[in-house]
Amino acid sequence: KPAAVAAALALSTALLAGCGSTAASSDSVAESTAVSESTAEEAEEGDADEVAAKNCADLIDAIYVQERTDDTDAQCEAAKAAWDALTDTQKEMVESENADPEYFGRDTGDASKDDPRNEDEIGENELLVVSFGTSFNGSRAADIKGIEDALQAANPDWSVRRAFTAQIIINHVQARDGEKIDNMKQALDRAVANGVKNLVVQPTHLMHGAEYDEMCEAIDEYKDKFESVSIAEPLLGEVGADATVINEDKEAVATAITTEAVKTAGYEDAAAAAADGTAFVFMGHGTSHTAKVSYSQMQTTMETLGYDNVFIGTVEGEPEDTACEAVIEKVKEAGYTKVVLRPLMVVAGDHANNDMAGA
Protein backbone atom coordinates (compact mmCIF):
# COMPACT_ATOMS: atom_id res chain seq x y z
CA LYS A 1 0.00 0.00 0.00
CA PRO A 2 2.75 2.57 0.79
CA ALA A 3 4.44 1.78 -2.57
CA ALA A 4 1.18 2.32 -4.42
CA VAL A 5 0.69 5.64 -2.67
CA ALA A 6 4.23 6.66 -3.61
CA ALA A 7 3.71 5.72 -7.26
CA ALA A 8 0.47 7.64 -7.42
CA LEU A 9 2.09 10.73 -5.95
CA ALA A 10 5.01 10.43 -8.39
CA LEU A 11 2.66 10.15 -11.35
CA SER A 12 0.75 13.20 -10.20
CA THR A 13 3.99 15.16 -9.94
CA ALA A 14 5.03 14.14 -13.46
CA LEU A 15 1.71 15.23 -14.89
CA LEU A 16 1.94 18.55 -13.10
CA ALA A 17 5.42 19.11 -14.61
CA GLY A 18 3.73 19.83 -17.94
CA CYS A 19 5.83 20.30 -21.12
CA GLY A 20 9.21 20.84 -19.46
CA SER A 21 12.36 18.95 -20.47
CA THR A 22 12.47 15.18 -20.12
CA ALA A 23 15.49 15.39 -17.80
CA ALA A 24 13.77 17.90 -15.57
CA SER A 25 10.68 15.75 -15.45
CA SER A 26 12.71 12.66 -14.60
CA ASP A 27 14.55 14.47 -11.81
CA SER A 28 11.27 15.81 -10.48
CA VAL A 29 9.67 12.38 -10.53
CA ALA A 30 12.66 10.80 -8.76
CA GLU A 31 12.68 13.49 -6.09
CA SER A 32 8.93 13.28 -5.58
CA THR A 33 9.08 9.49 -5.38
CA ALA A 34 11.72 9.67 -2.64
CA VAL A 35 9.67 12.18 -0.64
CA SER A 36 6.50 10.16 -1.14
CA GLU A 37 8.13 6.93 0.02
CA SER A 38 9.42 8.72 3.11
CA THR A 39 5.94 10.08 3.84
CA ALA A 40 4.43 6.63 3.33
CA GLU A 41 6.96 5.08 5.72
CA GLU A 42 6.13 7.71 8.34
CA ALA A 43 2.43 6.99 7.90
CA GLU A 44 3.10 3.28 8.25
CA GLU A 45 5.11 3.88 11.41
CA GLY A 46 2.30 6.06 12.77
CA ASP A 47 -0.21 3.28 12.13
CA ALA A 48 2.10 0.80 13.87
CA ASP A 49 2.35 3.09 16.90
CA GLU A 50 -1.43 3.33 17.13
CA VAL A 51 -1.85 -0.43 16.80
CA ALA A 52 0.74 -1.15 19.50
CA ALA A 53 -0.74 1.44 21.88
CA LYS A 54 -4.29 0.16 21.31
CA ASN A 55 -3.19 -3.41 21.93
CA CYS A 56 -1.74 -2.41 25.29
CA ALA A 57 -4.86 -0.40 26.16
CA ASP A 58 -7.08 -3.38 25.31
CA LEU A 59 -5.00 -5.63 27.56
CA ILE A 60 -5.31 -3.13 30.42
CA ASP A 61 -9.09 -2.99 29.92
CA ALA A 62 -9.16 -6.80 30.13
CA ILE A 63 -7.76 -6.73 33.69
CA TYR A 64 -9.70 -3.65 34.78
CA VAL A 65 -12.47 -5.89 36.11
CA GLN A 66 -13.88 -6.82 39.50
CA GLU A 67 -13.94 -10.58 38.93
CA ARG A 68 -10.91 -12.85 39.01
CA THR A 69 -10.80 -15.73 36.50
CA ASP A 70 -8.42 -18.56 35.62
CA ASP A 71 -6.92 -16.25 32.97
CA THR A 72 -6.22 -13.29 35.26
CA ASP A 73 -2.57 -14.10 36.01
CA ALA A 74 -1.73 -14.55 32.32
CA GLN A 75 -3.66 -11.39 31.39
CA CYS A 76 -1.76 -9.32 33.96
CA GLU A 77 1.54 -10.62 32.62
CA ALA A 78 0.51 -9.94 29.01
CA ALA A 79 -0.53 -6.36 29.77
CA LYS A 80 2.80 -5.56 31.43
CA ALA A 81 4.77 -7.23 28.62
CA ALA A 82 2.88 -5.17 26.05
CA TRP A 83 3.63 -1.97 27.97
CA ASP A 84 7.33 -2.78 28.34
CA ALA A 85 7.58 -3.39 24.59
CA LEU A 86 6.29 0.10 23.73
CA THR A 87 8.48 3.06 22.84
CA ASP A 88 8.11 6.26 24.86
CA THR A 89 6.04 7.74 22.03
CA GLN A 90 3.74 4.72 21.96
CA LYS A 91 3.29 4.78 25.73
CA GLU A 92 1.93 8.32 25.54
CA MET A 93 -0.67 7.06 23.04
CA VAL A 94 -2.14 4.40 25.36
CA GLU A 95 -5.73 5.54 25.88
CA SER A 96 -9.08 3.82 26.41
CA GLU A 97 -11.97 3.82 28.84
CA ASN A 98 -9.80 2.50 31.68
CA ALA A 99 -6.26 2.79 30.32
CA ASP A 100 -3.84 5.70 30.16
CA PRO A 101 -0.05 6.16 30.36
CA GLU A 102 -0.22 6.46 34.16
CA TYR A 103 -1.60 2.94 34.65
CA PHE A 104 1.91 1.51 34.32
CA GLY A 105 3.93 4.71 34.08
CA ARG A 106 3.07 6.63 37.23
CA ASP A 107 5.54 6.40 40.10
CA THR A 108 3.52 5.61 43.24
CA GLY A 109 6.39 4.48 45.44
CA ASP A 110 8.41 1.36 46.13
CA ALA A 111 6.25 -1.79 46.08
CA SER A 112 9.00 -3.79 47.80
CA LYS A 113 8.26 -1.90 51.04
CA ASP A 114 4.83 -3.51 51.17
CA ASP A 115 3.98 -7.02 52.41
CA PRO A 116 1.07 -8.93 50.82
CA ARG A 117 0.91 -11.17 53.91
CA ASN A 118 -0.09 -14.30 52.02
CA GLU A 119 2.29 -16.82 53.62
CA ASP A 120 1.14 -20.33 54.46
CA GLU A 121 1.64 -22.54 57.56
CA ILE A 122 0.56 -19.80 59.94
CA GLY A 123 -1.00 -21.74 62.80
CA GLU A 124 -4.57 -22.11 64.03
CA ASN A 125 -5.35 -18.45 64.82
CA GLU A 126 -5.68 -15.96 61.98
CA LEU A 127 -6.49 -12.24 62.08
CA LEU A 128 -7.58 -11.36 58.55
CA VAL A 129 -7.37 -7.64 57.80
CA VAL A 130 -9.75 -6.75 54.97
CA SER A 131 -9.28 -3.52 53.02
CA PHE A 132 -10.67 -2.05 49.83
CA GLY A 133 -7.07 -1.59 48.72
CA THR A 134 -5.01 0.97 46.82
CA SER A 135 -2.65 0.84 43.84
CA PHE A 136 -0.50 3.61 45.34
CA ASN A 137 2.51 1.70 46.65
CA GLY A 138 3.65 4.31 49.15
CA SER A 139 0.17 4.72 50.62
CA ARG A 140 -0.39 0.97 50.76
CA ALA A 141 2.85 0.42 52.67
CA ALA A 142 2.30 3.34 55.04
CA ASP A 143 -1.43 3.03 55.67
CA ILE A 144 -2.69 -0.51 55.13
CA LYS A 145 0.56 -2.25 56.05
CA GLY A 146 0.87 0.18 58.96
CA ILE A 147 -2.47 -0.98 60.33
CA GLU A 148 -1.58 -4.63 59.78
CA ASP A 149 1.78 -4.20 61.51
CA ALA A 150 0.12 -2.53 64.50
CA LEU A 151 -2.43 -5.33 64.78
CA GLN A 152 0.33 -7.95 64.60
CA ALA A 153 2.29 -6.20 67.34
CA ALA A 154 -0.81 -6.03 69.54
CA ASN A 155 -1.71 -9.68 68.92
CA PRO A 156 1.53 -11.70 68.84
CA ASP A 157 -0.29 -15.03 69.25
CA TRP A 158 -2.25 -14.49 66.04
CA SER A 159 -1.08 -14.49 62.43
CA VAL A 160 -2.15 -11.33 60.60
CA ARG A 161 -3.09 -11.84 56.97
CA ARG A 162 -4.43 -9.54 54.24
CA ALA A 163 -7.32 -9.47 51.78
CA PHE A 164 -8.43 -6.73 49.38
CA THR A 165 -12.02 -6.46 48.15
CA ALA A 166 -11.19 -4.51 44.96
CA GLN A 167 -10.06 -6.99 42.29
CA ILE A 168 -9.38 -4.06 39.95
CA ILE A 169 -6.71 -2.84 42.36
CA ILE A 170 -5.33 -6.33 42.97
CA ASN A 171 -4.88 -6.78 39.21
CA HIS A 172 -3.26 -3.36 38.84
CA VAL A 173 -0.67 -4.03 41.52
CA GLN A 174 0.02 -7.54 40.23
CA ALA A 175 0.44 -6.43 36.61
CA ARG A 176 2.59 -3.40 37.36
CA ASP A 177 4.66 -4.55 40.33
CA GLY A 178 4.39 -8.34 40.39
CA GLU A 179 2.92 -8.24 43.91
CA LYS A 180 0.13 -10.77 44.40
CA ILE A 181 -2.50 -9.81 46.98
CA ASP A 182 -5.35 -12.16 47.92
CA ASN A 183 -8.96 -11.25 47.29
CA MET A 184 -11.57 -12.40 49.81
CA LYS A 185 -12.09 -15.85 48.28
CA GLN A 186 -8.37 -16.49 47.94
CA ALA A 187 -7.72 -15.40 51.52
CA LEU A 188 -10.49 -17.57 52.94
CA ASP A 189 -9.47 -20.57 50.83
CA ARG A 190 -5.89 -20.06 52.04
CA ALA A 191 -7.06 -19.98 55.67
CA VAL A 192 -8.94 -23.24 55.20
CA ALA A 193 -5.95 -24.88 53.48
CA ASN A 194 -3.68 -23.71 56.31
CA GLY A 195 -5.86 -25.44 58.89
CA VAL A 196 -6.93 -22.23 60.64
CA LYS A 197 -9.46 -22.96 63.39
CA ASN A 198 -10.16 -19.49 64.77
CA LEU A 199 -10.71 -16.63 62.34
CA VAL A 200 -11.09 -12.99 63.33
CA VAL A 201 -11.85 -10.54 60.53
CA GLN A 202 -10.89 -6.90 61.04
CA PRO A 203 -12.05 -4.58 58.25
CA THR A 204 -10.35 -1.26 57.62
CA HIS A 205 -13.54 0.08 56.07
CA LEU A 206 -14.81 3.37 57.42
CA MET A 207 -18.46 2.35 57.75
CA HIS A 208 -21.14 -0.27 57.19
CA GLY A 209 -21.23 0.38 53.43
CA ALA A 210 -21.42 -1.80 50.33
CA GLU A 211 -17.86 -3.11 50.72
CA TYR A 212 -18.54 -4.16 54.31
CA ASP A 213 -21.77 -5.90 53.29
CA GLU A 214 -20.02 -7.81 50.49
CA MET A 215 -17.26 -8.83 52.89
CA CYS A 216 -19.78 -10.24 55.36
CA GLU A 217 -21.54 -12.17 52.60
CA ALA A 218 -18.25 -13.73 51.49
CA ILE A 219 -17.37 -14.76 55.05
CA ASP A 220 -20.82 -16.22 55.65
CA GLU A 221 -20.14 -18.88 53.00
CA TYR A 222 -17.10 -20.09 54.97
CA LYS A 223 -18.42 -20.02 58.55
CA ASP A 224 -18.74 -23.80 58.73
CA LYS A 225 -15.06 -24.17 57.74
CA PHE A 226 -13.78 -22.83 61.07
CA GLU A 227 -14.42 -23.52 64.74
CA SER A 228 -15.02 -19.82 65.38
CA VAL A 229 -15.47 -16.73 63.20
CA SER A 230 -15.70 -13.16 64.50
CA ILE A 231 -16.20 -10.01 62.42
CA ALA A 232 -15.22 -6.66 63.90
CA GLU A 233 -17.10 -3.41 63.41
CA PRO A 234 -15.84 -0.86 60.88
CA LEU A 235 -14.08 2.26 62.17
CA LEU A 236 -17.19 4.41 62.71
CA GLY A 237 -19.21 1.64 64.34
CA GLU A 238 -22.94 1.16 63.86
CA VAL A 239 -24.74 3.47 61.47
CA GLY A 240 -27.73 4.68 63.47
CA ALA A 241 -31.16 5.81 62.29
CA ASP A 242 -30.50 9.42 61.26
CA ALA A 243 -27.98 12.28 61.27
CA THR A 244 -28.56 13.05 64.95
CA VAL A 245 -27.39 9.62 66.15
CA ILE A 246 -23.76 9.45 67.24
CA ASN A 247 -21.74 6.84 69.12
CA GLU A 248 -18.50 6.39 71.02
CA ASP A 249 -16.65 5.18 67.93
CA LYS A 250 -17.47 8.33 66.00
CA GLU A 251 -16.56 10.50 68.98
CA ALA A 252 -13.19 8.77 69.30
CA VAL A 253 -12.45 9.20 65.59
CA ALA A 254 -13.59 12.83 65.58
CA THR A 255 -11.37 13.67 68.55
CA ALA A 256 -8.34 11.85 67.15
CA ILE A 257 -8.41 13.32 63.64
CA THR A 258 -9.18 16.85 64.82
CA THR A 259 -6.45 16.81 67.46
CA GLU A 260 -3.89 15.63 64.90
CA ALA A 261 -5.03 18.12 62.25
CA VAL A 262 -4.90 21.05 64.67
CA LYS A 263 -1.46 20.05 65.92
CA THR A 264 -0.08 19.60 62.41
CA ALA A 265 -1.44 23.01 61.42
CA GLY A 266 0.48 24.59 64.30
CA TYR A 267 -2.40 25.52 66.63
CA GLU A 268 -2.82 24.80 70.32
CA ASP A 269 -6.41 23.67 69.84
CA ALA A 270 -9.38 23.96 67.48
CA ALA A 271 -10.59 27.12 69.20
CA ALA A 272 -7.25 28.85 68.54
CA ALA A 273 -7.48 27.86 64.89
CA ALA A 274 -11.02 29.25 64.69
CA ALA A 275 -9.87 32.54 66.21
CA ASP A 276 -7.26 32.71 63.45
CA GLY A 277 -9.94 32.22 60.80
CA THR A 278 -8.98 28.62 60.02
CA ALA A 279 -11.44 25.85 59.26
CA PHE A 280 -10.71 22.15 58.84
CA VAL A 281 -12.47 20.11 56.17
CA PHE A 282 -12.25 16.31 56.26
CA MET A 283 -13.12 14.72 52.92
CA GLY A 284 -14.56 11.21 52.79
CA HIS A 285 -15.26 9.12 49.71
CA GLY A 286 -19.05 9.36 49.77
CA THR A 287 -21.54 6.62 48.96
CA SER A 288 -25.06 6.01 47.68
CA HIS A 289 -25.43 3.23 50.28
CA THR A 290 -27.78 3.85 53.21
CA ALA A 291 -24.67 4.12 55.38
CA LYS A 292 -24.04 7.56 53.83
CA VAL A 293 -25.78 9.05 56.86
CA SER A 294 -22.57 8.22 58.75
CA TYR A 295 -20.94 11.30 57.20
CA SER A 296 -23.77 13.51 58.46
CA GLN A 297 -23.45 11.85 61.86
CA MET A 298 -19.75 12.70 61.88
CA GLN A 299 -20.67 16.35 61.28
CA THR A 300 -23.11 16.15 64.19
CA THR A 301 -20.36 14.60 66.30
CA MET A 302 -17.96 17.44 65.51
CA GLU A 303 -20.57 20.00 66.53
CA THR A 304 -21.42 18.07 69.70
CA LEU A 305 -17.73 18.05 70.68
CA GLY A 306 -17.53 21.81 70.16
CA TYR A 307 -15.50 21.68 66.94
CA ASP A 308 -17.51 24.39 65.19
CA ASN A 309 -14.74 25.04 62.64
CA VAL A 310 -14.54 21.41 61.52
CA PHE A 311 -16.56 20.28 58.52
CA ILE A 312 -17.20 16.88 56.90
CA GLY A 313 -17.28 16.66 53.09
CA THR A 314 -17.36 13.90 50.47
CA VAL A 315 -15.61 13.52 47.13
CA GLU A 316 -18.56 11.76 45.50
CA GLY A 317 -21.06 14.27 46.90
CA GLU A 318 -23.31 11.90 48.82
CA PRO A 319 -25.02 12.68 51.09
CA GLU A 320 -25.89 16.07 49.56
CA ASP A 321 -25.19 18.06 52.72
CA THR A 322 -21.55 16.91 52.56
CA ALA A 323 -21.01 17.65 48.85
CA CYS A 324 -18.06 19.97 48.11
CA GLU A 325 -20.34 22.83 47.05
CA ALA A 326 -22.38 22.56 50.25
CA VAL A 327 -19.28 22.48 52.45
CA ILE A 328 -17.73 25.47 50.67
CA GLU A 329 -20.89 27.48 51.33
CA LYS A 330 -20.86 26.48 55.01
CA VAL A 331 -17.24 27.60 55.39
CA LYS A 332 -17.93 30.92 53.66
CA GLU A 333 -21.05 31.61 55.69
CA ALA A 334 -19.12 30.93 58.90
CA GLY A 335 -16.57 33.56 57.88
CA TYR A 336 -13.43 31.43 57.80
CA THR A 337 -10.69 32.70 55.49
CA LYS A 338 -8.30 29.74 55.61
CA VAL A 339 -9.05 26.06 55.08
CA VAL A 340 -7.00 22.98 55.95
CA LEU A 341 -8.11 20.08 53.75
CA ARG A 342 -7.52 16.53 55.04
CA PRO A 343 -8.76 13.08 53.97
CA LEU A 344 -11.35 11.20 55.99
CA MET A 345 -10.12 7.98 54.43
CA VAL A 346 -8.16 5.00 55.66
CA VAL A 347 -5.80 5.29 52.68
CA ALA A 348 -4.49 8.47 51.06
CA GLY A 349 -4.56 6.90 47.60
CA ASP A 350 -6.23 7.87 44.33
CA HIS A 351 -8.84 10.23 45.78
CA ALA A 352 -6.39 12.02 48.05
CA ASN A 353 -3.76 12.37 45.30
CA ASN A 354 -6.04 13.23 42.39
CA ASP A 355 -9.41 14.54 43.61
CA MET A 356 -8.11 16.45 46.63
CA ALA A 357 -4.46 17.35 46.03
CA GLY A 358 -5.07 17.64 42.29
CA ALA A 359 -8.19 19.79 42.58
Q: Predicted segment positions?
A:
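Bacterial Sec-dependent N-terminal signal peptides
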Residues: 1-6
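Beta-rich interaction/scaffold domains
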Residues: 44-107
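Bacterial lipoprotein signal-peptidase II cleavage site
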Residues: 19-29
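Post-signal peptide N-terminal segment of mature Sec-exported envelope proteins
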Residues: 27-48
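C-terminal motif of bacterial Sec signal peptides marking the signal peptidase cleavage site
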Residues: 14-18
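Extended amphipathic ligand-handling, pore-lining, and cofactor/metal-binding catalytic surfaces
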Residues: 102-340, 345-359
